[in-house]
Amino acid sequence: MMMKRVGLITGIALPLYIMLFSNFGGSEQTSRMAACAVMMSIFWITEAIPLAATALIPLTLFPILGIASSKATAAQYMNSTVFLLIGGFIIALAMQRWNLHKRIALNILAVFGGHPIQLVLGFMLATAMLSMWISNTATTLMMLPIALAIIARYEQFLSEQQAHRFTLGLLLSIAYSASVGGMMTLVGTAPNLVFARFYQLVSDQSVGFAQWMMMALPIGICLLLTLFVVLSLLYLRNLPNSTELRQLVDGEKKELGKFSSAEKAVLLVFLTTATLWITRKGINVGSFNIQGWSSYLPYGEMIDDGSVAVAMATLMFFIPATGRQGEKTTLLDKKVFSELPWPIVLLFGGGFALAFGFTESGLSAYLAEQLQGLKSVSLYVLILSVTTGMNLLTELTSNTATTQLVMPILLSTAKVMEISPVWLMLPATLSASCAFMFPVATPPNAIIFGSGRIKVVEMVKVGVVLNIIAILVISGMSYWLIPYIWVT
């Protein structure tokens, strides 16, 4: 509460001081834009008002301060990237409505035996695979009750110390796998789509789904393996096997009943959507090229992943289904629109409007002039610095809001360095998903901490190690992979 109060006072007083007494590049418009950026930064970091409310500030202040017209500012709040987000959420909600996500998770868990190490590996794979396509929060909320039931059964024949170690290993594996899984696809988590929009703005090209996955998938797999090794060494050694754990998973599967026709239909739509996303733009790695399906259509250049997402989401309102009580319905109905995360949609728009203001006011050009000293810094050191800074920032702030704030600054930095913005924007985006230390860092961390089974100091202890590993892996693999996958 105190943080919010301080944020509210500072978020108003400091921008007023900047407008009245500071001079950014000798331009009043630049100073006004800097004041708006500072206000939004403080409000987003302290959450003095809701994040979505802060995102609406440009619509009010930009026209009043002469930065941009209402019409031009409002246009930033809705674009194809936002529709990709909305379409992806609708498909994810269909999976949740018909319990397809739970069936997928339990089938993955059933493959692994009753040994704690194998079970944790199963939880990590199930969580990561689901969070690639549905929200990290929804995935964690679904996996947590299953994990708690297994913990309750397993701790009956363990010592208190063994039970606590197993609890830590299993619950932390869910939180961290949800975050890492989200980074591996373009729709897995909001910062990825923020990157996609900014990349489109600066390059006039869309980010291909396969292009993203060729970069993020190897990094994500490397991080998951590292997570598994670290958690196994810290918490899962010398724990006994148990056939009861497998029986519990099998029991959960039986409760779901038979694979319904509605689940099959949602699965077919989901697989078709994923295939269309991945193959739309084709695959280009060095001299290796495969044409995407859109290149064979008369107006294929007008289609993007947002078009695919909305088309497939709309299709589910037409496909008939039988409800759990035998009633006739469709895969989705009008209720889904009340379940969409509209605050995140507004948060996206606010970030894009902020970036638009940076360009329109000349603040981006001013920042580029001030960053001339970075020319002497080596590229790898710069990537490492950006990755580290982003990782630390997102430990205490919203990763989506932070990504929105940082992108315009990274664009200015890249301009000074005379390099492609991808070198800085991509590692920053990936590291935004790797805040492992504090409960407030990510929704999965907060949900797992909210179970009451983990102390803050226990999360910090393993989180510090994993943060360092994530920074090194993302920096190193970005430096190595970007030249092969992106035009730099």
Predicted segments, located by residue:
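C-terminal transmembrane helix pair
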Residues: Q156-F157, L217, V345-S364, V377-T488
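Membrane-embedded alpha-helical segments and adjacent helix-loop junctions characteristic
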Residues: F21, M39, A52-Q161, E327-L331, ...
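Alpha-helical transmembrane segments
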Residues: S80-I90, M132-M143, M213-V229, E301-M312, ...
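Hydrophobic core segments of alpha-helical transmembrane domains in multi-pass membrane transport
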Residues: L8-S22, C36-T46, L59-I64, G87-L93, ...
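Re-entrant/interfacial helical elements at transmembrane boundaries that shape
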Residues: I57-L59, A138-A152, L171, M184-L201, ...
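Interfacial loop-to-helix junctions that mark the boundaries of transmembrane helices
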Residues: M2-M3, F24-S31, F43-W44, K71-S80, ...
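Flexible hinge motifs at transmembrane-helix junctions and intramembrane kinks/re-entrant loops
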Residues: F24-Q29, M39-L56, T73, T137, ...
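Juxtamembrane and boundary regions of transmembrane helices in multi-pass small-molecule transporters
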Residues: M2-F21, R97-L100, N136, L158-S177, ...
